[in-house]
């Protein structure tokens, strides 16, 4: 295979949506920090929704973006908590994959801490091919050619080869 056609993991994003600020959100931040050794960033609501009791610009979640070796390590940890199984519907047409884990204690090596409680989390993995910079650069950005876009099948194959994932 051509070196420029091999997909790779650009980033992995872990998100814990709490739905409210305060003590519960700080516990979720503490969990992410102990899980990946990196400080999370808070995300804020964009609109007011009185049914959920959320006001605009209120902190409701926290997330962390991982790249390189850290991303590979955390993806393999979380996938082993899911018994290395992913549905084909969890891949989008750009080749990215998103999956959730119901309870963080399902991840091997993570123990229950009564101070933190139990949280679920969403994991999103973004795939790219070399040459993606032409789309994101500041000067003279160009459209990404079709050959440099990651397809659903390519990312499925990557996950099977590198993480021993069975796709249902």
UniProtKB/Swiss-Prot annotation:
Question: What GO CC terms are in its UniProt record?
Answer: ribonucleoprotein complex; ribosome
InterPro entries, per database record = Ribosomal_uL5, Ribosomal_uL5_arc, Ribosomal_uL5_C, Ribosomal_uL5_dom_sf, Ribosomal_uL5_N
Signal sequence extent: none
Any single biological process term in GO: translation
Give one Pfam family: Ribosomal_L5
Q: Which UniProt keywords apply?
A: Ribonucleoprotein, Ribosomal protein, RNA-binding, rRNA-binding, tRNA-binding
| GO MF annotation terms | rRNA binding; structural constituent of ribosome; tRNA binding
Instruction: Decide whether keyword rRNA-binding is in the record.
Output: yes
Q: Is Plastid set as a keyword in this record?
A: no
Q: How does it assemble?
A: Part of the 50S ribosomal subunit; contacts the 5S rRNA and probably tRNA. Forms a bridge to the 30S subunit in the 70S ribosome.
| Known function | This is one of the proteins that bind and probably mediate the attachment of the 5S RNA into the large ribosomal subunit, where it forms part of the central protuberance. In the 70S ribosome it contacts protein S13 of the 30S subunit (bridge B1b), connecting the 2 subunits; this bridge is implicated in subunit movement. May contact the P site tRNA; the 5S rRNA and some of its associated proteins might help stabilize positioning of ribosome-bound tRNAs.
Tell me the protein family, please: Belongs to the universal ribosomal protein uL5 family.
Protein's UniProt name: Large ribosomal subunit protein uL5
Q: Which organism is it from?
A: Methanosphaera stadtmanae (strain ATCC 43021 / DSM 3091 / JCM 11832 / MCB-3)
**What taxonomic classification does the UniProt entry list for its organism?**
Archaea, Methanobacteriati, Methanobacteriota, Methanomada group, Methanobacteria
């Amino acid at each position: 295979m051509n070196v420029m056609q091999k997909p790779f993991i650009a980033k992995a994003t872990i998100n814990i949506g709490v739905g409210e600020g305060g003590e519960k959100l700080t516990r979720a931040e503490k969990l992410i920090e102990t899980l990946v050794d990196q400080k999370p960033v808070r995300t804020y609501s964009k609109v007011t929704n009185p049914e959920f009791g959320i006001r605009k610009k209120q902190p409701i979640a926290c997330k962390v973006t991982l790249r390189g070796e850290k991303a590979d390590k955390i993806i393999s940890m979380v996938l082993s908590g899911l018994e290395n199984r992913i549905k084909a519907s969890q891949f989008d047409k750009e080749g990215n994959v998103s999956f959730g884990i119901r309870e963080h204690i399902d991840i091997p090596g993570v123990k229950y801490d009564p101070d933190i409680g139990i949280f679920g989390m969403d994991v999103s993995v973004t795939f790219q091919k070399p040459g993606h910079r032409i789309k994101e650069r500041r000067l003279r950005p160009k459209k990404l050619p079709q050959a440099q876009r990651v397809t659903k099948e390519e990312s499925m194959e990557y996950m099977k080869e590198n993480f021993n994932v069975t796709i249902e």
